[in-house]
Structure formats: structure tokens, C-alpha cells
């Protein structure tokens, strides 16, 4: 509702924002995934003209993937899954998905990336206007500077705008640093 009142065209939430992270063994529970899907549909019903990208676990034929649900015109238009499972806490609970996909949001060609897939730049269409990466990266000494430098270098080399949205807060023994930025 706040995004509507401020005239936003797009609102973006971090990886697994809907389920919380790490959701661990809950990601293997069909009922939990179904509840996440219901909550996603509820969010979509409130979006109206605003596009949204929401981090959510999605059950596929191969298992549960971490995905970016793209909401347009009040409906979940598609889910783009994380390709590279690199965090040990995710292994065993998540499976690999198809990775980066290019979509059109608000008239812009956008490469949507989930998780660490941003570090593998060869996987996105070079004709995009914006690279949007949703993430749930934990705090690590020097990592915020490293991520900002990586984004800056990628924006410079590829001549692209980059939007990184990272989880903020804490869960179990993990603290998320909230490294979010727009570069380019």
C-alpha cells in the first residue's frame, strides 16, 4: 500500500523474503510451500498496477527451488529460479533451477537473478537494461565492500544498471547484512 501511495512502479523483496531464511527442513514440507504460494497470491492481489519481485520457495518436479516470483497486473506472471546452490545451509533443502531469465518490467528489459548467480555474468542476456539480483547473503567481514566493488565493476564493464536487494536481519545463527544498492 505504501508503494502505491508513493507512486512506485516496482517493489522488490529479497531472496526467500516470503518464507524467511534459512527455512531449512520447512523447504521439504509441501504444506509450508503451499502456504507460501497462498501468501504470494494474496500479495499479488494487492499489487494492482505495481510490478513486484518477491523471493519465495517454489515446489517443482525436481524439488524445491529458491525463486523470484514476478508479479505483474495483479498476477504471478512467472517464477525465475536460482541456478547455483552454493551455501551449505541450502544443500539438501533446495535444488538447482534454470537460473537467470530476461523479462520486461515497466518497459525495461530486466535480467532477474536469484542468489549468487550475479557472480556468473556470462549467464544473462547482454541486451538487458537492468540486472536485478535478489539475495540472502549473510554478513561477513569485508563482504559488503566486496559486493559493492563487484557491482561497480560489473556495471562499468557491462555498461548496465544493477540493482542488488539483500536480506536484512537475523535468523538462527545467521545475520544478514542488508547489502542493497543500485549502481549504474
Predicted regions: what they are:
Residues 1-184:
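Enzyme catalytic cores with a strong preference for nitrogen-chemistry domains
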Amino acid at each position: 500500500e505504501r508503494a502505491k501511495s508513493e507512486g512506485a512502479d516496482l517493489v522488490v523483496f529479497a531472496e526467500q523474503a516470503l518464507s524467511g531464511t534459512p527455512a531449512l527442513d520447512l523447504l521439504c514440507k509441501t504444506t509450508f510451500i503451499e502456504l507460501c504460494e497462498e501468501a504470494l497470491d494474496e500479495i499479488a492481489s494487492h499489487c494492482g498496477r505495481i510490478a513486484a519481485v518477491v523471493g519465495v520457495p517454489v515446489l517443482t518436479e525436481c524439488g524445491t527451488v529458491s525463486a523470484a516470483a514476478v508479479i505483474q497486473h495483479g498476477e504471478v506472471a512467472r517464477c525465475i529460479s536460482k541456478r547455483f546452490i552454493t551455501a551449505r545451509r541450502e544443500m539438501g533443502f533446495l535444488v538447482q533451477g534454470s537460473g537467470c531469465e530476461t523479462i520486461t518490467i515497466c518497459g525495461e528489459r530486466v535480467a532477474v537473478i536469484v542468489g549468487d548467480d550475479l557472480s556468473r555474468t556470462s549467464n544473462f542476456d547482454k541486451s538487458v537494461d537492468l540486472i536485478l539480483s535478489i539475495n540472502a547473503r549473510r554478513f561477513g567481514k569485508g563482504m559488503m565492500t566486496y559486493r559493492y566493488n563487484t557491482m561497480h565493476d560489473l556495471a562499468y564493464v557491462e555498461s548496465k544498471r544493477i540493482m542488488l536487494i539483500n536480506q536484512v536481519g537475523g535468523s538462527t545463527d545467521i545475520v544478514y547484512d542488508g547489502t542493497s544498492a543500485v549502481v549504474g
